[in-house]
Amino acid sequence: MFEINPVNNRIQDLTERSDVLRGYLDYDAKKERLEEVNAELEQPDVWNEPERAQALGKERSSLEAVVDTLDQMKQGLEDVSGLLELAVEADDEETFNEAVAELDALEEKLAQLEFRRMFSGEYDSADCYLDIQAGSGGTEAQDWASMLERMYLRWAESRGFKTEIIEESEGEVAGIKSVTIKISGDYAYGWLRTETGVHRLVRKSPFDSGGRRHTSFSSAFVYPEVDDDIDIEINPADLRIDVYRTSGAGGQHVNRTESAVRITHIPTGIVTQCQNDRSQHKNKDQAMKQMKAKLYELEMQKKNAEKQAMEDNKSDIGWGSQIRSYVLDDSRIKDLRTGVETRNTQAVLDGSLDQFIEASLKAGL
């Protein structure tokens, strides 16, 4: 015999939670806007303006994530109720178990949509840039920066985000000195914004012939891509623009022209650079776009003391600004802000970061 009342209570609970989300996420307005966007994308001349078409496509994906999920929730809950009625009438435990399994799947889907309420910031839905900088410590720190780069690239891949290496400076022996990665996808900045800070590694160094334990630091800094229509005034006199040859491993594909571009904003000391295109003009445009994004983020941080402290972390690679500790010898990774801890260090280094990110977002960091 199976208990039907607890399942009916769950259906009622999910129905109420869905209704709350419909209001909070403005379902009716989003559904109407989705119809408008679909109509625009069906126009034969829409691709005459590729940037606008791409923006509409991105908007459609974001709208569908809300509208389609809530539509599926409504239909799914009705279907589960129907299955339960059949199970009771036929006294069929197999049908009952099928209904419960469908209900479990619906609850997980709803929980994912509820989590999007964490993304309430103005730019949470934007694409973003991730800067990783090796701290002092030479080869060991540079290898750690490379491990972080791999970890974030794996994480982004697992979430279906697109990644692009904008600039990378290789280490002298191993690893990297720094890297800038562009991460594109739905709520990329919202997902990654709490990852800004210093990451501490403790391990027996493979670069130490004595096998001694070393502590290394690398910093991560996340900032949103700013739309071109955002008004950020940059005085050309405040900029120093340098061009240089693209670094590479050698061979016939090395770029022998000075196409790489580095831009320094003298008043703030902010530096952006790009070398991923053979065209100096395109690299300069990309570096200016990053500069605009960084200056916008700096303005946002001036209005928010907590974010300002986060920006300070970027230049303070040491004990005081750590967000996470990776102690590989003890098989322990711990987030120092939320207390979330795991023993599965390899999974985390392979990109399994959601438990840390979700906890920090829920904590309002």
UniProtKB/Swiss-Prot annotation:
Predominant location category: cytoplasm
Cited InterPro entries: PCRF, Pep_chain_release_fac_I, Pep_chain_release_fac_I_sf, PrfB
Resulting phenotype, residue 252 to E: Loss of methylation. No longer allows ArfA to rescue stalled ribosomes
General remark: The gene for this protein contains a UGA in-frame termination codon after Leu-25; a naturally occurring frameshift enables complete translation of RF-2. This provides a mechanism for the protein to regulate its own production.
A Pfam family reported for this protein in Swiss-Prot or TrEMBL: RF-1
A GO CC annotation given for this chain: cytosol
Subcellular location(s) per record: Cytoplasm
Short motif (GGQ motif): ranges: 250-252
Organism of origin: Escherichia coli (strain K12)
SMART domains: PCRF
Lineage: Bacteria, Pseudomonadati, Pseudomonadota, Gammaproteobacteria, Enterobacterales
Protein name: Peptide chain release factor RF2
